[in-house]
Amino acid sequence: MTHAAAFGELTGQDVVVDQLERAVSAAASGAGTMHAWLFTGPPGSGRSVAARAFAAALLCGEQGCGQCASCHLVAAGTHPDVLLVRPDGLSYGVRQTRDLVLKAATAPVLGRWRIVLFEDADRATEQAANALLKAIEEPSPRTIWLLCAPYADDLPTTIRSRCRLVTLRTPRTDAVARTLEHEGV
């Protein structure tokens, strides 16, 4: 099966790509989409890559063409409607999370959505998780939260229960070998 170009860097994750492409298609048709997604998987599975590809596909007029300005901006980490968040130190503090929640509530600049890609969401302190929960419970209508963590159990149940779960697996060796061969490595 051929997938949108935005998902091209996801090796061995066809089930996940199918799930995300269906969500992008539903959003493009006006059916809307879940406001919070939790991408889980062990290190090297591509959870942050999947979340970034999903953001690109949601913001692309062609559902993830990989060629337009929007797709390039997301790939470069410079799209004004995508807030890419990493912890300042070992964990996310409540101040950083509250600032993020305020930014997330602003209207998108170029696209239909304001997307918050929250890498290592499992590293939020308890107070930060509570601030995040409030934003996820009462989302802005044009904000989509993409949380990344190794395991769903790494986040509080109250947050997990409000997210659509996307579970990535470690890619099979043969899939990785095919990708490396295709890349000329």
Summary of predicted features, one role per range:
Residues 1-120, 127, 144:
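P-loop/Walker A NTP-binding region and its immediately flanking N-terminal helices
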Residues 156-185:
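Conserved AAA+ ATPase core "coupling" helix
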